[in-house]
């Protein structure tokens, strides 16, 4: 659920501070500054630049934007995309959408632990591959993918790399430079923030096009009046998640390991679906 301190931070922006951040009057300028502050919090959490964070309505929009707009922008270079069979439907359905429009998509299998096989990834790369999209951590079994290695492979071949980090952001440390990530999707409600708010990290220099057209918000890349309460919510939730990450991880890992051990020991014919170590709790 939404953490009490997140709700408390959001409340004034429903009533007291209700100015439109895109307007020119002083009442609006205050909210514009608040949005910049939240953008900085998220950027710092990822080791990114402030101007590389774009607010959206959630993880699904971010995933759709990353795949569809990248395909459109780089379609003259190639029409081949690589992803996996265990992605969130926001990725899988976006991939299907692109297939119907002339793009080819390779769906990689995973091993018994839910991990992408790097040799399979390398074998799937073609001269016309423009994008690799692999989720950071699986939303069903929690398996964390070898993101850094995948990013290295992508960049060695001049391919853009996107990761759906909805299940991982705020749960495990992420540095976009160290992991060679070009685009990253995240959502507020997965880190005790509000629903209906997320963001897409887009590395500077990636020629991704606008997905929602209209106004000039989000540096002309995502139109629509900014959801100020939601943005304050995801910023506060991010700050809280980073601050408490070490303590939460220790406690939750102990509970997880205890549960797995008891179930495997006491219930016949059970097996663990996923990994017991490299996974989000």
Could you describe each region identified by the protein language model?
Residues 1-281:
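Pyridoxal 5′-phosphate
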